Amino acid sequence: MDGSMNLGNEPPGDGGGGGGLTRQGSIYSLTFDEFQSSVGKDFGSMNMDELLKNIWSAEETQAMASGVVPVLGGGQEGLQLQRQGSLTLPRTLSQKTVDQVWKDLSKVGSSGVGGSNLSQVAQAQSQSQSQRQQTLGEVTLEEFLVRAGVVREEAQVAARAQIAENNKGGYFGNDANTGFSVEFQQPSPRVVAAGVMGNLGAETANSLQVQGSSLPLNVNGARTTYQQSQQQQPIMPKQPGFGYGTQMGQLNSPGIRGGGLVGLGDQSLTNNVGFVQGASAAIPGALGVGAVSPVTPLSSEGIGKSNGDSSSLSPSPYMFNGGVRGRKSGTVEKVVERRQRRMIKNRESAARSRARKQAYTVELEAEVAKLKEENDELQRKQARIMEMQKNQETEMRNLLQGGPKKKLRRTESGPW
């Protein structure tokens, strides 16, 4: 395999026999009737959130039953994975039922005018099928999800293909002619780690076209048929680069940097720092991307639009319901804990008040008993004093009288 590979300038290919969402042995090639009969559920009344969860469960069951393990060094044979890429559901569709979404798609197909939630590719498909109106049971899961605007992350599949093709002397091999000249705008810790781990040579410098990890690619690196049928204005214009010939592996590959969250690429690779082999620190500078082709975003609700609006790329609410519930439960726990502490404080305060009241009552009772005893003692003393005073008065009267007085007698009445 030639070391110089430009993922964006390769001739269009069939992608190993499968463009779009499906591959051989995929669940997405089943129709709704087949999927409902195999699962045993009615998906018409389910919302899109529950439909995706059922599809993921069926994927996991199929992967466990098949027992296929991805092999990095096995070429295209290692790509026969039963587990598909993750799906990104727009916020406007997460709570709609499957019947409602299908009615909207049917209306768009009959009128020929696309709504805000449908891409131009879905409009073209609906117009081509306007001659014969399909039912929901005849539509495959792939067609339904594409027309509804659900986005697939197939960049990781392309990354595995590149790893399988370059395993002989690529990212972690010992060949020295497999480096690529990567020129991007800001460093990422994953890029630094990959640059340290890789055995980078210094013989040749090859250009690597940087593409978003959310753009679906075929096995040979070409764009899918959906992207070939529609070209839009690029979100990021081409910028001049300085061409540092750094012998590095495909550090921008989604297999190395792991892709982003829910269809988003690693945005840290679009910053303003470049790396040079053998340098002990990063060299800041406005480094561009060599041979950058215009990025063609997939026209859907889940990925960027023509005006660069990426508000719909935010993750769906159902993916973070656990975090919201955790915050709510934490708040409730705090309120309950605060209430319990307040109740404990009130109980302790009431107990202290009762103890003070009881102690005060006991003290008052003791004081009353003491006062009663003192009163009785004083009354006894007063009685004794009164008796003594009475006796003294009687004795004083007797002493003052001194005995019986003599009576005056007339002994002689006269001289005669």
Curated annotation (Swiss-Prot):
Residues 13-22 have a biased composition (Gly residues). Residues 336-399 form the bZIP domain. Disruption phenotype: Defective in glucose response and grows faster. Exhibits abscisic acid (ABA) insensitivity. Its main location: nucleus. It comes from the Eukaryota. Changing residue 135 to A: Abolishes ABA-dependent phosphorylation. SUPFAM superfamilies: Leucine zipper domain (SSF57959). The keyword RNA-binding does not apply. Changing residue 86 to A: Abolishes ABA-dependent phosphorylation. The activation by phosphorylation is induced by abscisic acid (ABA). Phosphorylated by SRK2C, SRK2D, SRK2E, SRK2F and SRK2I in vitro. The modification Phosphoserine is found at residues 26, 45, 86. It is found in: Nucleus. GO terms for molecular function: DNA binding; DNA-binding transcription factor activity. This is ABSCISIC ACID-INSENSITIVE 5-like protein 5. The gene is ABF2.
